[in-house]
Regions:
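Extracytoplasmic metal-acquisition and chelation regions
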Residues: 1-181
Length: 181
C-alpha cells in the first residue's frame, strides 16, 4: 500500500495480528502520501488543475515535514499512557513509548484489573495520560500522579492539517516531557 500501517495493540502494547490501527493520518509521512494521493486523483478528474494540485501537495509536504522534524530526538523514548491507544503513529516523530491504555474502547470505562496493571507496571513515578476531553477524572485519578492531557486525535474543528497536527504534537510532547524527571 501507499501508507505505512501499524497493527492495533492490546491494552499492554502487544500487537494484535491481522489488524490495522486506522489512525494513519497521524504519521507525518503518511499525511504527505495522502496529500499526494489526493492530488494525483484530483489531477485525473480535473487535468486542467494538475499543476495547482501538485503544487499544493508539494507545499503541504514541505510544511508537514518541517513541523514534524522539530520533535526528532536521539534521547531514550519517553513513556506515556493513553485512555485508548490512538497515538502510535505519533510515536516515531515524537520519540514516545506506549506504556499502556486504560481501555480499548473510548466509550467503555477502564476495568479495575487494567488500572492495577498500569499501577504495577508504571515506567515513571509520574505519567502523562493522553485522553479525550470527555474522560472523567474518576476514571483515571487512581493512577495519580498523572499529568492529564486532553487531546483529540480526529482533530475535529480544525481547518488546517499542519496546524492541527502541530497542536496535537506540541500538547503531547509537553505532557510527556513534564513527567521525565
Amino acid at each position: 500500500g501507499i501508507l505505512t500501517t501499524l497493527p492495533q495493540r492490546n491494552l499492554r502494547g502487544a500487537a494484535l495480528s491481522n489488524t490495522v490501527d486506522s489512525h494513519v493520518w497521524l504519521d507525518p509521512n503518511n499525511a504527505v502520501r495522502i496529500a499526494f494521493f489526493i492530488a494525483t486523483l484530483r489531477s485525473q478528474q480535473y487535468p486542467e488543475n494538475k499543476a495547482k494540485y501538485m503544487a499544493n501537495a508539494k507545499e503541504f509536504s514541505q510544511q508537514m515535514l518541517q513541523v514534524s522534524q522539530q520533535y526528532e530526538s536521539s534521547n531514550k523514548a519517553k513513556p506515556y499512557w493513553s485512555y485508548h491507544d490512538a497515538y502510535q503513529y505519533l510515536e516515531r516523530a515524537l520519540n514516545l513509548k506506549f506504556a499502556g491504555a486504560l481501555t480499548d474502547d473510548p466509550h467503555i470505562a477502564p476495568t479495575a484489573a487494567q488500572i492495577k496493571y498500569l499501577m504495577d507496571n508504571r515506567p515513571k513515578a509520574q505519567m502523562c495520560l493522553l485522553a479525550e476531553t470527555s474522560a472523567s477524572s474518576s476514571q483515571y485519578r487512581k493512577l495519580n500522579p498523572v499529568v492529564f492531557q486532553p487531546v483529540d486525535e480526529s482533530m475535529r474543528g480544525e481547518d488546517n492539517f499542519v496546524t492541527a497536527w502541530k497542536k496535537l504534537a506540541s500538547k503531547t510532547d509537553k505532557c510527556v516531557l513534564s513527567t521525565q524527571n
